[in-house]
Amino acid sequence: MSLNNYWSRLLQTQWRDGGWLSRLLHPLSRLVDRSVRLKREAYRDGRKQAWRAPVPVVVVGNIYVGGTGKTPVVVAVLEGLRARGYTPGMVSRGYGARIQGPPRVGQGQLDPAAFGDEPALIAAATGAPVAVHPRRALAAQALLAAHPEIDVIIADDGLQHLALARDIEIVVQDERGTGNGLLLPAGPLREPPARLNEVDAIITNLNTGPAQVAQTGAARHWAMWLEPLDAQRVTDGKRQALSAFRGKKIAAAAGIGNPGRFFRTLESAGLSPSPRLALPDHYDFSRSPFHDVRAEAIFITAKDAIKCARLKDTRLWSVQVRACFSDPDFLDWLDARLRNLP
């Protein structure tokens, strides 16, 4: 095991269970906690002003750092609202893209280097207009200027970006819940666990195991899981059932916040890939990590696939997934909340 992998696993264990390293970092977490509280108080008492869009804003975010399954939820929300008569658009920070000038607005097939991995994936999956900028209020203004027909904005991963006023907050968490309950760096949280009592809804990504979730009083709570649909070859778009790969020599790779979740999704489809490459989140694939992989097929995430076309590796297959909710009334609940906003 490399030194980097050792420290990464140690940190993840400490974030889940606590321990000596978490205790050592606890004073820094107290400073982060104070900074977070002061920021929220500044917006609450009017010392800082949030920009309010002329249309409703729905934030989909989390308090646990890293991947919890937000992107499939954003896709489901965009598609669900469109099916209910809305014209939705999305704003995002555009993580990984260097945006130093005005916001970037696009639709359809977008360059992940210019828009970021998640916005490019969501735009391709839904066809919804997207705008990206570190200042999400500017992104929202640019989105509405370019697409005045938009009547609801979905803010991807914007829970802590208080400069953009919001009407509905949805938190996506996974089976890790709130971990050891501490803020960064002693724990995995961006905000205190009590923040969950203030949001409108909590969606827990169960994956294939039992959830250990925080108990909250105010929020509606749904469970979700990712259902694997089929595989799409990256080089030519050919689709094939996942069952067709059973019995073949297959591998898997994921450059996302929680690679293990992707590997378990494949297992739920009856596949046992080996090797399994856990790549860094937002891995850019400027160099192929697959040269030494001996496999007939290599499964990758849809987010990684948008960056892998240039590799021209016919073994690469993107696994298409769909967010399923424990109660199908989630999107109806969201529709009703939007229609009853003041």
From Swiss-Prot:
Enzyme Commission code(s) on record: 2.7.1.130
Keyword terms of this UniProt record: ATP-binding, Kinase, Lipid A biosynthesis, Lipid biosynthesis, Lipid metabolism, Nucleotide-binding, Transferase
Pfam families: LpxK
Chemical reaction(s) catalysed: a lipid A disaccharide + ATP = a lipid IVA + ADP + H(+)
The UniProt record lists the keyword Transmembrane: no
Pathway: Glycolipid biosynthesis; lipid IV(A) biosynthesis; lipid IV(A) from (3R)-3-hydroxytetradecanoyl-[acyl-carrier-protein] and UDP-N-acetyl-alpha-D-glucosamine: step 6/6
Binding residues for ATP: Y64, V65, G66, G67, T68, G69, K70, T71
GO biological process: lipid A biosynthetic process; lipopolysaccharide core region biosynthetic process
GO molecular function list: ATP binding; tetraacyldisaccharide 4'-kinase activity
Broadest EC class assigned to this enzyme: transferase
GO cellular component, one term: plasma membrane
Reported function: Transfers the gamma-phosphate of ATP to the 4'-position of a tetraacyldisaccharide 1-phosphate intermediate (termed DS-1-P) to form tetraacyldisaccharide 1,4'-bis-phosphate (lipid IVA).
Matching NCBIfam families: lpxK
Family under the similarity heading: Belongs to the LpxK family.
Name the record gives this protein: Tetraacyldisaccharide 4'-kinase
Annotated source species: Bordetella avium (strain 197N)
Phylogenetic placement of the source organism: Bacteria, Pseudomonadati, Pseudomonadota, Betaproteobacteria, Burkholderiales
